[in-house]
Amino acid sequence: MTKVALLIAYQGTAYSGWQQQPNDLSIQEVIESSLKKITKTRTPLIASGRTDAGVHAYGQVAHFRAPDHPLFANANLTKKALNAILPKDIVIRDVALFDDNFHARYLTIAKEYRYSLSRLAKPLPWQRHFCYTPRHPFSTELMQEGANLLIGTHDFASFANHGRDYNSTVRTIYTLDIVDKGDSLSIICRGNGFLYKMVRNLVGALLDVGKGAYPPEHLLDILEQKNRREGPSAAPAYGLSLHHVCYSSPYNNFCCEQCSVSTSNEG
């Protein structure tokens, strides 16, 4: 059976997150509702992972099994039909038709999140839902020092909020870069997977380092504790975006150019 893969961008401001919730509007619910208008039956979506309330996405990936409908035999027509129905804060960027072996969640080999920060006392109007302005000045040099210590394979239990069950809290961060753009900056984090609120907690810790609350080396002590109570406060959700999800061949050219790059340094 054909699986239809969707590359999705959304502004998470008005939603309770990706996953369908009993009493709140979710991204998943809105897209499934749009599919139902086409198929006249519920078509479940499976995403690469769940984004929290207020978190955005430029490159979320989700799939569904193609119902018996002529529209889903053509990727471009599927994209046009869904975008014609969806609200303006959810966009299908691309559609691919894959074999039954594809799975948006289980075949993920890497994800990249980006967190946006502003140095402006009052963010520009178009930044207010996407860019967090810390109350204290911060040093990007100290933040990068701290970020370098977090790269690699570690037990990130101290950076994971409770609320999800994991077989292991060990994850690998491939890159963690502070990109300074003057009035704004991005924290770009790429890894093989992330725990619940892990990226926002990492950003919170790096901001603590940046404002001088503790030295970069203290991040290693936090890691060693393996205790969320020893970890930092999470940065706000609205600064975070799931930028892209990576898959190996033959699905690696769908969601981003970086998926086709060798992952030999990501073991």
Curated annotation (Swiss-Prot):
* GO BP annotations listed: tRNA pseudouridine synthesis
Keyword Isomerase attached:
yes
For this UniProt record, the keywords arranged alphabetically read as follows: Isomerase, tRNA processing
Known catalytic reactions? uridine(38/39/40) in tRNA = pseudouridine(38/39/40) in tRNA
Catalytic-site annotation from UniProt: 52 (nucleophile)
Residue numbers binding substrate: 113
- Cite the EC number: 5.4.99.12
Keyword Isomerase recorded:
yes
Any one GO MF term held by the record is: tRNA pseudouridine(38-40) synthase activity
The residue range of the signal peptide is: none
Function recorded in the entry:
Formation of pseudouridine at positions 38, 39 and 40 in the anticodon stem and loop of transfer RNAs.
The record describes its quaternary structure and partners as: Homodimer.
Q: Which HAMAP family match?
A: TruA
Q: Give the family, as the similarity comment puts it.
A: Belongs to the tRNA pseudouridine synthase TruA family.
**What's the name of the protein?**
tRNA pseudouridine synthase A
Q: From which organism does this entry originate? A: Chlamydia pneumoniae (Chlamydophila pneumoniae)
